[in-house]
Amino acid sequence: MGANSSSISELPDNEYLKKLSGAEPISENDPFWNQLLSFSFTTPTNSADLKLLEEATVSVCKSLVEKNPRTGNLGSLIKVFLSRTKELKISAECQNHLFIWQAHNALFIICCLLKVFISRMSEEELQLHFTYEDKTPGSYGTECEDLIEELLCCLIQLIVEIPLLDITYSISLEAVTTLIVFLSCQLFHKEILRESLIHKYLMRGRCLPYTSRLVKTLLYNFIRQERSPPPGSHVFQQQTDGGGLLYGIASGVATGLWTVFTLGGVGSKATPQLDQCSPLANQSLLLLLVLANLTDAPDTPNPYRQAIMSFKNTQDSSAFSSSHPHVFQINFNSLYTALCEQQKSDQATLLLYMLLHQNGNVRTYVLARTDIENLVLPILEILYHVEERNSHHVYMALIILLILTEDDGFNRSIHEVILKNITWYAERVLTEISLGSLLILVVIRTIQYNMTRTRDKYLHTNCLAALANMSAQFRSLHQYAAQRIISLFSLLSKKHNKVLEQATQSLRGSLDSNDSPLPDYAQDLNVIEEVIRMMLEIINSCLTNSLHHNPNLVYALLYKRDLFEQFRTHPSFQDIMQNIDLVISFFSSRLEHAGAELSVERVLEIIKQGAVALPKDRLRKFPELKFKYVEEEQPEEFFIPYVWSLVYNAAVALYWNPRDIQLFTMDSG
């Protein structure tokens, strides 16, 4: 590096990097370090520059891998960085730009080297490079482990203790990035790592006491969304003489958004590059998700997950429980606001899911909010644009709704919140609709999309479970929401008839031919009948619990009464059809007595009058529909690849060669 580097492409020939990776040991006190660390640059963020930087770093690393066991220069560089960080807090308070600048540059080089080392060697090999012992070969173990632990601990201290100012923003970001890089060994393993060396250091020993402070700081970084300092307030001034590391590189390198690779199993579309004006917030959230999803050690639960599960509101004055060792307090109002504002990203939705599912304090607070629409509307928008989202993002949004609908208070309150002009809902102009009716519309639309495209049973199940949880509390359903409920049933009915016909034809064909195996129409029929049963239970639940609140649903039911005829005598639906049949018969009779040519308004009036007169004791009682979200066994098999796919796609200034990734599959098509 040094003051004379002018472009990434020149890095392999840079005299300072050649010396660092050369055959000559460099002591920690050598003036060389001041020369190496005196460079000015803007960290690259586009794909072309990042790929160039990676390739240049690989070239330097090859030499360093070969020579470092004899020179110990990597260890010396790390010790130089460690010695400089001891005075960082004072430097920040005293506005010592030069000191912070050089400390940042040291960490940037360490991070670049580490990223290549970790992608190309085992943890055992990595350990060997963290020490140099000239006297007694084989005695490296303790010292190298201590140096790794010391660096990890130093990075955590830097994140939690250094005040976030314009001059410290970049080094704080680099510290978060380096911790992500330390944990990135998972990317290069197909199986989930359960006993990683780095995990061990982060979960016990010197790092452990910082657990709650680290989680709290990362959360506050996400909450505050601090923007990257503007050029000019930054410690790294761009040199006007062309001496800056990346000066003039745009003329020789094609720039543009990072080409994001589609992840098999993570989505069918590439995730768009997100607005990276708050890189520290983005990177902090990604690190938090990685830490929270580390697997438990055999004898120790993941302390970062414990901290996520147990933190409390700053307004909560109750004593900390001794059963939660990593409790801290955070401003829930600020957290709620940030969660509402950031739901366009997968990682913010995943954080919301984790907090609602794992932290009872957060869940209770969210459900008590009187502005719940600020949280629910962004989630509904994710589901509405299902074709633009990867499947994991849709699942997380859906499970969040399912968790919320487990609460009766939520199911009541959403029908009291009236919304005006939902501009993103394109199928129909909705000038005024309750949040509850909009939620029903979006969930039904998701089911219909799934029926025609992905045919994912898991998605169906969660959509229907959310509707079922809400059904007893349906209130004043919008006429369009009521129509869509019955339209969905109509679609299911047609699908049932089609599958039934295919099954019948298949059975006839099997009697005439013994050749190829036939499609399993019986299983298809079973699945569609399960979904129909669930829809009938949802309609029945609304009719038995809140018929008088929902004239529009009764109207839609009567308008399409012929749909239900075929299911009256079906053995799978006879019991649940009794109430629906009774309601249809009761109101049909009243409408017939009222005469022909009735207006919509008159029909609704008759329905409202009839709802009061309908003898409730004639409606058969069924168990209340209640579904609870339960995380599957070994959730890490889902969440760890998902989290790392988010890191791969959304991390700022981090590039990994897609050919090296083992944890998830790449699909460029």
Curated annotation (Swiss-Prot):
A lipid is attached at G2 (N-myristoyl glycine). It is found in: Cytoplasm; Golgi apparatus. Keywords: Cytoplasm, Golgi apparatus, Lipoprotein, Myristate. One of its GO terms (cellular component) is Golgi apparatus. It comes from the Eukaryota. InterPro entries: Dymeclin. Its main location: cytoplasm. Pfam families: Dymeclin (PF09742). One of its GO terms (biological process) is Golgi organization. Myristoylated in vitro; myristoylation is not essential for protein targeting to Golgi compartment. Disulfide bonds: none annotated. The keyword Cytoplasm applies. Necessary for correct organization of Golgi apparatus. Belongs to the dymeclin family. This is Dymeclin. It comes from Gallus gallus. The gene is DYM.
